[in-house]
């Protein structure tokens, strides 16, 4: 059941025409031992299926770069919330992460990252406290 919900969430990371949003370049700034906490994030296979047992590579370094390949904006109590698929490489092997971020302001018109100009976008990603590993990892994201 949860697997089906995960797969549905992954497939919802498309725009109205059914194509992937992006790609947008981004820099993932890892702070507060975020590399360890990223192991709690589910991975998405290249085929778009969720693999709840997959773990991101441990050697993600602060300032690691990747490509945001899709976003799925959702309206929540705290504003716009989005599922972001983040693609990077580990030893030359592509791997895609999925993590949930509250967009909200200061993004224009409460738009998601997908609506920002498709240029190099620097993101400062830090965990939202308190961190609860029992729920989907949530990170605050703001453009710089």
What do the predicted segments below correspond to?
Residues 1-144:
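Intrinsically disordered, low-complexity segments enriched in small/polar residues
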